[in-house]
Curated annotation (Swiss-Prot):
Name of the protein: 3-oxopimeloyl-[acyl-carrier-protein] synthase
Subunit structure: Homodimer.
Outcome after substituting residue 260 to A: Exhibits poor activity. Loss of activity
Chain segments carrying region ACP-binding: 256-260
Family of this protein: Belongs to the thiolase-like superfamily. BioZ family.
EC number(s) from the headed UniProt entry: 2.3.1.-
NCBIfam families: PRK05963.1 (NF004623), PRK09352.1 (NF006829)
Function: Involved in the formation of the biotin precursor pimeloyl-ACP. Catalyzes the condensation of glutaryl-CoA, an intermediate in lysine degradation, with malonyl-ACP to produce 3-oxopimeloyl-ACP.
GO BP of this protein: biotin biosynthetic process; fatty acid biosynthetic process; secondary metabolite biosynthetic process
Amino acid sequence: MQTRSSRMAGFGHAVPARCVDNAEIEASLGLEAGWIERRTGIRSRYWAEAGDTLSGLAERAGRMALEDAKINADDIALTLLATSTPDHLLPPSAPLLAHRLGLTRSGAIDLAGACSGFLYALTLADGFVRTYGRAVLVVAANILSRRINPAERASAVLFADAAGAVVLTPCPEVKRGVLSADLVADGSGYDLIQIAAGGSSQPFSAGMIAEDALMTMRDGREVFSRAVALMTNTSQRVLHEAELTAADISRFVPHQANARMSDAVCGNLGIEREKTVRTIGSFGNSSAATIPLSLSITNAERPLAGGETLLLTAAGAGMTGGAVVYRV
């Protein structure tokens, strides 16, 4: 029998200093003015500069969340870092993050779940809090600008750098936290979005072409249609499992991949547009970081109140994806 749940006790986010507007990218790709915003909803995004690191970006977001939660560092028992762009292939970046934040009693691991990584981390964190009654720091962060192929329009116009963080703490009210979750994978779309080189299947080599170390989106339309279907279907299942309808959702926080994608999923679910949290216009697509960044921003604009019901959903490379209903 459940005796506790989890509570979102603190939020944080961080972006690099450099803001890149559409005009700069449109000029480099030979696109007409306004092309990017019309097709993606993005007006600007943030890209890392020479001294920026993934762990540094994650640290800023994590510290903000810890301060917001007003929690002692010794109370954090686990640190989960969802990222596709760690500082190094080995070791993982999460132990360094925990060290810099002074989390001396925390375990720490990286999770590589692409754009849906935060949902996986959040679901695992909620289970840990319920089982062990100890707090968890969840951070999602990416520096995607260093993996963009500047000549490939599909990825060059979308991707951004950012970090978002949430602190989960134990809560005695069992009807809070994750009410339902549906995490899925479809490996038939494994190569739709990829960085070919760097793994054990294709290690870095002296004769490697530069593009193999950069992100490639093989078929943008296929990615769009699969992602919309995946996010719609998983969202419908978690609503059904939680015995809720779209009308019961207080805020809908989808992965900020593309404004048209969010609109399509929102329409499929029958969720009112004003309930949808949108940050893609100013921050672009930072993969797993978009949902916690959006949570931090919406909480700053209008604090999340106890009892609010959130619907979170994402889809990304792999393909991986899912949806979560979370009661604040």
